[in-house]
Amino acid sequence: MPGLRPLLSPPASEALLLAQAQQLSGYSLGELAALAGLVAPKDLKRDKGWIGVLLEIWLGASAGSKPEQDFAALGVELKTIPVDSLGHPLETTFVCVAPLTGNSGVTWETSHVRHKLKRVLWVPVEGDRSIPLADRRVGSPLLWSPNEEEDQQLRLDWEELMDMIVLGQVERITARHGEFLQLRPKAANAKALTEAIGAQGETILTLPRGFYLKKNFTRTLLARHFLLQG
């Protein structure tokens, strides 16, 4: 642990970012919180994004919840991913909020989803709920860009979901739509409504939606990387 400290400014290169992330591997969240002068919450019920915030502090992330990537100068997005003892993802991964209006002319190439997933630093974290939060360890990081096949898989799902949004079918979309990318309501409470297009082209109010990567996508991605690593 000697010399291990959070980055006070965004890293100047991918190599520096990855090196810092690799240094965190094996440490518990409690240890990293203490070194950063923070107290780990008992659980994540009221602090759902706490692990991400902790790692943003350690890695010198800049964006917060702004639309650009967490490491805007590098074009890299940070994604923490809770995994079980086998390294399998325990939940879907939030990508970004879905635009429900003003989508004429939008393409996969210029989409927010593709922008966010262009370059991702994945940091697996133990997610087994039987392990106290402070004792959960950080795993080995992975700096990833979608290959041609992954990009095509995501594009097909995105196009299907966006077609439904544009055609006024947002209320008919379920988590089962999309093979690897899904659209789900994203709101802290059911009163937070946003405008969308209805079946007759009229403006309706509905829950905000978010794009999420399904577990089958991230599981394959992590498994391939760590098999290669091994």
UniProtKB/Swiss-Prot annotation:
One GO term of the biological process aspect: mismatch repair
Entry keyword set: Cytoplasm, DNA damage, DNA repair, Endonuclease, Hydrolase, Nuclease
Matches recorded under InterPro entries: DNA_mismatch_repair_MutH (IPR004230), DNA_rep_MutH/RE_typeII_Sau3AI (IPR011337), DNA_rep_MutH/T2_RE_sf (IPR037057), Restrct_endonuc-II-like (IPR011335)
Coiled-coil ranges per UniProt: none
Highest taxon of the lineage: Bacteria
Main localization category: cytoplasm
Record CDD domains: MutH-like (cd00583)
GO cellular-component term (any): cytoplasm
Residue pairs linked by disulfide bridges in the UniProt entry: none
Entry's localization field: Cytoplasm
Molecular function as annotated in GO: DNA binding; endonuclease activity
UniProt family annotation: Belongs to the MutH family.
Function field: Sequence-specific endonuclease that cleaves unmethylated GATC sequences. It is involved in DNA mismatch repair.
UniProt protein name: DNA mismatch repair protein MutH
